[in-house]
């Protein structure tokens, strides 16, 4: 028994992954990142009994929960996983249950420990847990904190999706934040742009700063900030990624000059826009050699509205993302774009070259110049109105000659 115990410790285990795809091992990139973590590392699971997800992380579930870290523990034997149990009010927790209306957190703890047949003294009180760490900014929901011996720490969260637990991508991204300065994505604001601080259907909080969204930039190794370059803010020299998302009023002269200087020094800029914004967006886009065509694209279909364009990834796009390189051409996958316009390119002062990412079919797609309501009205390509069914580009990437 003693031999079995000691040989089952992470530092004593040697693993040979015989799967063809190395399914049971960390990717080479994750191994490279993990190797840069020096000294012991601790992952502490903070489990709030009054959180609506607490049942997943109670003591009886320890072994199941630790499986996601097994590859990391095998690669780094001095990585230790710990648990801290506490109880405190959670905005999305059991306090929302009508049976707990008017109950104190102590009364809720007593009821929940009775239901789960647990010792109430296992759980630290709100005052006790706050002496260790204040998790109210995390909504007092379940969270893991990875910490190094020299005090560097990062959050590893669960997510509000079907899988819930973080994958290797999110765990490694969190580790990378501890060993290097994460790149900051700066969203331009002040001109009616879509905002990261709002959760409306036209805003960007879900994929930028929402803590419990798997796809959020902050959970994929980035930091996020907002910057108002039109009204006083200066672009910091450390910023190399900016987003200009569908401004509704033109940039001021100061803002435009800043953005041009930023591009001239080699900064990356994502420009996102929608149909109907040509008047505001085209003056700035023209300086980059890009123009949004005036009318929307239409696609003939027996099943869908004419404004639904089913775009395909170009061969060139495969150089930018492995998804477009492998899956899209292999399975003839499409990107659905309900309501879009074609983009045309011309010479520019920055030396940009253009890489088309998405394009339409060569047949059955045209710029509809006669009708504006493309959701319901049947439309046809009318050559006499100057409409032509050819392949159109509606998403492009820019590269300078130095980037190639």
Locations of regions flagged by a protein language model:
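Juxtamembrane extramembrane loops of integral membrane proteins
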Residues: 2-149, 155-164, 168-174, 182, ...
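A broad, low-specificity signal marking well-ordered, structured residues that form hydrophobic/aromatic
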Residues: 41, 144, 154, 290, ...
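Residue-level marker of positions within ordered structural domains that often coincide
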Residues: 48, 151, 180, 290, ...
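Sec-exported extracytoplasmic/periplasmic mature domains
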Residues: 74-77, 176, 180, 264, ...
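Acidic, S/T/G-rich, low-cysteine, solvent-exposed domains in lumenal/extracellular/periplasmic regions
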Residues: 204-399
């Amino acid at each position: 028994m003693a031999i079995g115990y000691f040989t089952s410790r992470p530092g004593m285990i040697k693993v040979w992954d015989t799967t063809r795809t190395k399914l049971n091992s960390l990717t080479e990139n994750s191994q490279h990142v993990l190797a840069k973590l020096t000294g012991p590392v601790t992952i502490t699971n903070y489990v709030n009994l009054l959180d609506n997800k607490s049942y997943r992380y109670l003591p009886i579930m320890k072994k199941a929960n630790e499986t996601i870290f097994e590859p990391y523990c095998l690669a780094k034997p001095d990585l230790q996983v710990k648990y801290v149990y506490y109880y405190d009010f959670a905005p999305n927790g059991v306090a929302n249950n009508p049976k707990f209306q008017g109950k104190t957190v102590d009364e809720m703890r007593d009821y929940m420990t009775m239901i789960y047949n647990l010792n109430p003294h296992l759980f630290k009180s709100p005052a006790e847990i706050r002496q260790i760490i204040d998790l109210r900014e995390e909504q007092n929901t379940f969270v893991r904190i990875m910490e190094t011996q020299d005090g560097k720490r990062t959050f590893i969260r669960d997510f509000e999706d079907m899988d819930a637990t973080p994958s290797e991508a999110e765990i490694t991204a969190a580790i990378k934040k501890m060993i290097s300065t994460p790149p900051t994505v700066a969203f331009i604001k002040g001109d009616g742009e879509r905002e990261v601080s709002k959760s409306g259907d036209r805003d960007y909080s879900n994929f930028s700063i929402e803590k419990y969204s798997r796809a959020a930039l902050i959970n994929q190794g980035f930091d996020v900030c907002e910057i108002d370059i039109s009204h006083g803010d200066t672009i910091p020299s450390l910023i190399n990624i900016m987003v200009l998302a569908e401004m509704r009023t033109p940039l001021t002269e100061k803002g435009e000059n800043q953005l041009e200087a930023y591009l001239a020094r080699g900064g990356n800029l994502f420009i996102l826009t929608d149909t109907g914004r040509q008047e505001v967006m085209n003056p700035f886009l023209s300086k980059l050699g890009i123009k949004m065509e005036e009318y929307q694209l239409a696609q003939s279909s027996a099943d869908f509205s004419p404004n639904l364009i089913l775009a395909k990834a170009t061969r060139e796009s495969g150089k930018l993302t492995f998804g477009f390189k492998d899956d899209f051409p292999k399975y003839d996958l499409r990107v659905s774009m309900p309501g879009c316009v074609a983009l045309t390119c011309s010479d520019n002062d920055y030396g940009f070259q253009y890489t088309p990412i998405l394009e339409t079919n060569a047949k059955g797609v045209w710029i509809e110049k006669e009708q504006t309501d493309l959701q319901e009205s049947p439309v046809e390509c009318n050559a006499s109105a100057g409409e032509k069914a050819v392949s159109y580009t509606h998403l492009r990437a820019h590269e300078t000659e130095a980037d190639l």
